[in-house]
Amino acid sequence: MSESQTLVVKLGTSVLTGGSRRLNRAHIVELVRQCAQLHAMGHRIVIVTSGAIAAGREHLGYPELPATIASKQLLAAVGQSRLIQLWEQLFSIYGIHVGQMLLTRADMEDRERFLNARDTLRALLDNSIVPVINENDAVATAEIKVGDNDNLSALAAILAGADKLLLLTDQPGLFTADPRSNPQAELIKDVYGIDDALRAIAGDSVSGLGTGGMGTKLQAADVACRAGIDTIIAAGNRPDVIGHAMAGLPVGTCFHAQESPLENRKRWIFGAPPAGEITVDAGATQAILERGSSLLPKGIKIVSGNFSRGEVIRIRNSEGRDIAHGVSRYNSDALRLIAGQHSQQIDAILGYEYGPVAVHRDDMIIR
């Protein structure tokens, strides 16, 4: 492990609180110690931290608040400053500075903002500063939220050009069944491809303390692995889990990266949360999946959501299954007008055209 590597460590609420109502500072100190040890060895560390709402609730003395988005954003606004202060305080013990980055989905959807976020993150790393990343919960609405820090950590790993992504949770890894209810469940140590059977095993279990369950961790692993990043799910309370994961020792479930990772532009397409979606017919589905063709307006059946030209959208077949993500050549209003029409009719219908395809194959990632 002598060569410098970049590791993204995602710490969920259940890890930071130990299942309690307050931040477990003693455990966070230990996690920081492990990160500082790797930092001293020349490795680059990125922290994706949950816990802003928990920190805000603790700081305000556990107030009785209505279960509304405004209440959560209030707690996040109070807690985020406390959280970053804690990370700075603990890393400073080892002479390490931290830099806060608060992101939303909009930072990933727009190519220019994506590149700006990437440059900021890499500048922090180049100057031996540990980036501490969280979603901007105090201002993010449902429309611009990534939604959970598992998927945010995968996007952060792509931005950082990471070698590994470590998702720390209250479980030792992915099991063949829920170990809390099935004593026969076995730990899955290695995964070389994520399929529907594995997604069914992961289910949608949530600890109740955060927004992510094993299902979202699988989504994050899928995104990261396709971008060439090994991903590990492991227990946050396992001794020296961060150092052992970095050294390649077995610590949980390892999702092995694709041997041929996506090039940079397609990493952005794959990582950006879709701004909308379109449903295509059987002919278009076959052309995309079997021939790698571009999507023509003729094959579009339904356009859902409101999105601009140049934004990433989800492409689904008539059964509702995701088949691809891609950059739309037209906005949602225009696509609704030309859906089901031949490409030669685009100019007559819209009064302009940006070419004969709705999504070009060079701007598309097959799911």
UniProtKB/Swiss-Prot annotation:
Its main location: cytoplasm. SMART domains: PUA (SM00359). It is found in: Cytoplasm. It holds the Pfam family PUA. The keyword Transferase applies. GO terms for cellular component: cytosol. Pathway: Amino-acid biosynthesis; L-proline biosynthesis; L-glutamate 5-semialdehyde from L-glutamate: step 1/2. ATP binds at residues 10, 169-170, 211-217. Residues 275-353 form the PUA domain. InterPro entries: AceGlu_kinase-like_sf (IPR036393), Asp/Glu/Uridylate_kinase (IPR001048), G5K_ProB (IPR041739), Glu/AcGlu_kinase (IPR001057), Glu_5kinase (IPR011529), Glu_5kinase/COase_Synthase (IPR005715), Glutamate_5-kinase_CS (IPR019797), PUA (IPR002478). It catalyses: L-glutamate + ATP = L-glutamyl 5-phosphate + ADP. One of its GO terms (biological process) is L-proline biosynthetic process. It comes from the Bacteria. Substrate binds at residues 50, 137, 149. SUPFAM superfamilies: Carbamate kinase-like, PUA domain-like. One of its GO terms (molecular function) is glutamate 5-kinase activity. CDD domains: AAK_G5K_ProB, PUA_G5K. Belongs to the glutamate 5-kinase family. Catalyzes the transfer of a phosphate group to glutamate to form L-glutamate 5-phosphate. This is Glutamate 5-kinase. It comes from Klebsiella pneumoniae subsp. pneumoniae (strain ATCC 700721 / MGH 78578). The lineage of its organism: Bacteria, Pseudomonadati, Pseudomonadota, Gammaproteobacteria, Enterobacterales.
